[in-house]
Amino acid sequence: MRGRPITIAALCADIPSRTLERCNVKVEILGFTTKNWKGGEAREKWSKNGKPKNPGRLNDLRHIIYKAADVHWRQSKKNLGLMLKEGLLKENIDGEAIQWAFNRLVKRKEERKIMMVISDGAPVDDSTLSVNSGDYLEKHLKRTVKFIEANSDIELLAIG
């Protein structure tokens, strides 16, 4: 997600988080991308190992904490600008990012937990999709969502 979509996503994260924080609701703003275009160390390792079939993800993940739940918005507002930094955001491996966010959220002590995902569409990583099925990342995302819905009381919302 880059350009106008990430600008809108940043606003969608910023405005509600400030409002909720004023109501003493803890909010965490997380982001995700890949470290490289078209693979990285994961793809190099796969290639060095003889390119076995069905390798799974072939790009390196970058998970970003723009605002931690226990950090006040004023202390992290500059971090939100990182979303707009040219060159930071690359490809999207949504399922693993949602697993990461889920693992963070289940550790929280709050009684009610809501995860809102703002997306520009389907997960995309050319390196992974070039050697796995074309719907590999989308299937993983759907399995991840089903797992969260079936195995936790976290409310999952999605835009995009």
Residue spans of the language-model regions?
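Acidic, glycine-rich A-domain
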Residues: 1-160
